[in-house]
Amino acid sequence: ISVLPEAATCSHILMMPQKFFDIIGKCPEDVKVLYIPTAGIETDGAREGFAVCFQELSSMGIRYENILVYNLELILSKDYQRTYSTCVTDPYMLTRLLTIEELQSFDAVVVSGGDAAVLCREMIRTGFDRTIEKAINNGLVYVGISAGSMYAAGNLDDGLNIINNPIIPHWNGTKIIELPDFGEAIKIVDGQAVYVEDDCISLI
């Protein structure tokens, strides 16, 4: 799912590069991406997706040096009181919760596939769920791949719930050509995406 200010797209938007850059409004070499792999770090099958995603981003013309990998599992819990690390007065950004301002320095956040429940758990544990929601409402583009799209849709009580409909990615049945009714599951085949901008939802 990808998101504009109060908006979102889903599943394989990276397979639609022109649409992606139209949304961002920048040339590929100028685009900065925050990549969140957290949903896919517990199985090798999901980890394979990291290489695929990086290849897709690179083939679109996005520079590797403009992609920051941000794994929520490395971030301290939001209520944890630091002990022996208190001597570190300016922790490196990959080891702490990003601020809204830092998050908004990126043009898009790409949230990978894997286990949506793991992603949701880590979002809540770290408090990043609140940060990313505020950044999206301020204009950050959200691109959810598989589990990342489920987290943004209506699949999880504690997800972003940008749309009320749950999303079922990698659907191997009949390709849908129109959206189902409010609250019903949106079954997306690979290569298809749901795009949300403000109150408008569409298939692309």
Predicted segments, located by residue:
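Active-site-adjacent pocket-lining segments in enzyme domains
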Residues: 105, 111-112, 116-143, 148-204
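N-terminal beta1-alpha1 cap of cysteine-dependent amidohydrolase-like domains
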Residues: 1-108
